[in-house]
Design a protein with these regions (language model features):
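Structured, solvent-exposed acidic/aromatic patches
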Residues: 2-47, 51-201
């Protein structure tokens, strides 16, 4: 109550402090310059969707379908419905590639999450697809059902045990940016997360 006027610090967690969009798309652009490996590119798309769905869930309409064209970051915004449609399209393409290459792998040195396992990445993609389907259940029940059933009935399936959880092994000075969000405004000696709500400061 002492500070009634809200600060804008909390909005920086996804868009400014961690530079989600610029860093993500510049890395994708550089990746496509050095490899044509379909497994690597499919994994990159899964990571992109995993990151960007949190952005649209936080802010609603975002630049997405046209972003990265000719290296552009500042492009027209898409409706959240269009963004989610694109998510499903990209996940389906990644799932198709990884299902076809499920017994293959990439170098473990290039994969800090699954050690190069294409099959585990495919399970993550299906699980992410299921999560996104549940997100839209009140907006488009028919599509939510279609996407959810498709994910669960996939040849590879979804994550069903902790052994297949996606865990990022931190390296260097950088960790998972979601850790920053969860611990934002966290009081000393607090055993739970912080508070990222507007005016939480």
């Amino acid at each position: 109550i002492m500070n009634y006027n809200p600060t804008d610090d909390w909005t920086n967690v996804f868009m400014y402090s961690d530079k989600t969009i610029p860093v993500l798309y510049s890395n994708l652009r550089e990746l496509k310059k050095v490899t044509e490996d379909p497994i690597v590119l499919a994994i990159a798309d899964i990571i992109k969707v995993a990151a960007m769905h949190r952005v649209t869930d936080a802010y609603g309409p975002i630049p997405y379908s046209m972003i990265g064209e000719n290296g552009q970051i500042q492009v027209p915004y898409d409706s959240q419905e269009k963004v989610y449609d694109k998510f499903f399209e990209e996940l389906d393409a990644a799932i198709k590639v990884l299902t076809e290459h499920r017994t293959d792998a990439i170098s473990a040195k290039a994969d800090y999450i699954y050690g190069g396992s294409a099959e585990k990445w495919c399970k993550l993609a299906n699980s992410l697809k299921l999560r996104l389907a549940m997100r839209i259940v009140y907006a488009n029940e028919a599509k939510a059902r279609e996407m959810a059933e498709s994910a669960v009935n996939s040849e590879v399936g979804v994550i069903t045990s902790n052994a297949d959880n996606a865990r990022l092994t931190s390296f260097g000075a950088d960790g998972n940016p979601i850790y920053v969000a969860v611990n934002y405004n966290k009081p000393a000696d607090c055993l739970t997360g912080g508070d990222t709500h507007a005016a939480a400061d």
